[in-house]
Curated annotation (Swiss-Prot):
Keywords: ATP-binding, Cell membrane, Disulfide bond, G-protein coupled receptor, Glycoprotein, Membrane, Nucleotide-binding, Receptor, Transducer, Transmembrane, Transmembrane helix. One of its GO terms (molecular function) is A1 adenosine receptor binding. It comes from Mus musculus. The gene is P2ry1. ADP binds at residues 46, 203-205, 283-287, 303-306, 310. Receptor for extracellular adenine nucleotides such as ADP. In platelets, binding to ADP leads to mobilization of intracellular calcium ions via activation of phospholipase C, a change in platelet shape, and ultimately platelet aggregation. One of its GO terms (biological process) is eating behavior. This is P2Y purinoceptor 1.
Amino acid sequence: MTEVPWSVVPNGTDAAFLAGLGSLWGNSTVASTAAVSSSFQCALTKTGFQFYYLPAVYILVFIIGFLGNSVAIWMFVFHMKPWSGISVYMFNLALADFLYVLTLPALIFYYFNKTDWIFGDAMCKLQRFIFHVNLYGSILFLTCISAHRYSGVVYPLKSLGRLKKKNAIYVSVLVWLIVVVAISPILFYSGTGTRKNKTVTCYDTTSNDYLRSYFIYSMCTTVAMFCIPLVLILGCYGLIVKALIYNDLDNSPLRRKSIYLVIIVLTVFAVSYIPFHVMKTMNLRARLDFQTPEMCDFNDRVYATYQVTRGLASLNSCVDPILYFLAGDTFRRRLSRATRKASRRSEANLQSKSEEMTLNILSEFKQNGDTSL
């Protein structure tokens, strides 16, 4: 997050309010705090490690995420028909990841260019919008996958009607609508800004002018689209594990797929989503309320850690394809079949070309032999 220096007071209104309270109460501490807050700004981290760390992570995510999700989409479209309910959710998850990795080349260039954004304000807004759509779309689709697997394991007979592909399509459309509507304020809050050295930054949160309202929006989004889904997922997995323990499902495909699902999804949350949301909230709070000289070192560490978690948050686009491979026997089986078929086709083409080349050589040899006679 390369932004203008932090300030506790986006537009000066809060500082004037605090100073007025200090004068009214005769409290010099409040008044002096307001004066310091209105004039003092902690500098951002001086290490510049994000110029190297973030592009390196994004390059890795782009390569692995592009290949993995391209294969996943190809499999779902051409080799996974007819779809099951869980296939619908996985396809939408792969689509969200694929759309996100397509935006990474511009972001990689941005950091190699010392965070000087050259692609315009609209592209900056679109970049941040797609990141958040992928982030929360992935969380909600993982929640749908977890709830689907919970119904199939805990209530295998009662859930037969609810787990149909048609219902999964309706739920997926609803998820996309919820995410797009909930994330649309990002198009207002994000954008570009010009620094004192005339370079252009692309805010990954917002400028100081809208920081306080953005913090409220961010907290609402975090609770509604991260905390609640996390609680639902943990509840589903607790009941799945309980059902696997008490039911005789030793070595069954359902047991194996369920265990893989629990491990992968919880790993994604532990590595990507939880650290990002914790540090994003701490960073916003530091920009708002911890702007004093003695807090600058703390703010600097918070900011640096937040940059690390931003890279981690993008790793889900690499991990999700592993979910399709390990948690879906059908996907793994059909991928193996499609790979063998493509390999045989390639071998047949090579053999055909080799035979054609041999015949051409023999033909030329005979012609040359005839003319020499």
